[in-house]
Amino acid sequence: MKIQLRYFASIREDLGLAAEELDSSALDAASLLAELRARGGAYAQALAEGRPVRVAINQVMARADTPLTEGAEVGLFPPVTGG
């Protein structure tokens, strides 16, 4: 299925990419992250296991088991903190 990926903050900087369209076989948020990590290189580093990454699907915060649908917009970003 085709999905639209949007990268934010340090993930965007690490990848050198703000957005891309992906033809993915991932069924949910967790399997999408695994698929992206498997690309290796900057993807493996930016989305490494243990590195906190938040996922939003169609602008709604997603859990690992949140399903993906054809044409979904998926945002990936680090947790935001402030003071």
Language-model regions: role of each:
Residues 1-82:
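Ubiquitin-like/PB1-type beta-grasp interaction modules and other compact soluble beta-rich domains
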